[in-house]
């Protein structure tokens, strides 16, 4: 351990070559299961604080430093050290810089920091205006990066897919959910409406994060009406299309069904990831919390889609959730009924990011 203590001391050496070698040699010790991971706790987390400073270093050193920070931030104690405003502003300045080569790695770091409830204070933070956004609010700029920056549309080095997990974690907490369900002044759009379109995106990261976001905000029963409003967000087609397969449906089944769900091609594929598929069906279950929601889903023929899913998916957990949804849709309605929703907290997004 004494040799390691000496090595971490070189992270703040005056010679940049020494700093570079030090961070390179320390990278293996950033793995959360490494038996000597505790070296990062040395002297009141001094090595972690050195890594924070190295983000302002030469690009090659900064790249190694942010990689190390992504890994060590899997630890809750380390995350507390990284949550100061000055460091968060530094990370955001990297993420929002269209020319910065470390934007995606920095988004990975934000994924881990977003596990902290205190991360919601970024809703009050601002950064300089960028040409891709009309807002100084950091959360608005992150949203614009996620929506406009896919497929390297803003930064040739980044696609911002990891922001989906950041947003998913934020919606675990009330303040985060409020942002994503509230009309924003700078563009007069509800953020959630920008995200639902990614339920069939090619990126597994995006689909996973967006599915979790939609599920989490669906716990807000008053907002469910906005979610299902066909003149507004109209979330149902975005939930159902990934669940639909190529099976031929009868005219009766399709009567009232969304146009985009009718007459699907023979090569139509369902969502391949079972975790995402289960999340989408669980969200539909949440949306049956009100009679209005249930009747809307009946009119729009949700049942035939779920029936075919149940018949064609080989996953018992998904089939069980399908059964729950079907029971809500086919049951008789009482004249007056006390509406309720499952007393479960929004999803705990347990995805911790690590760089190999």
UniProtKB/Swiss-Prot annotation:
One Pfam family here: DUF384
Matching SUPFAM superfamilies: ARM repeat
GO molecular function, one term: protein folding chaperone
GO biological process: chaperone-mediated protein folding
One term under GO cellular component: nucleus
Family: Belongs to the HGH1 family.
Name the record gives this protein: Protein HGH1 homolog
Annotated source species: Schizosaccharomyces pombe (strain 972 / ATCC 24843) (Fission yeast)
Lineage: Eukaryota, Fungi, Dikarya, Ascomycota, Taphrinomycotina
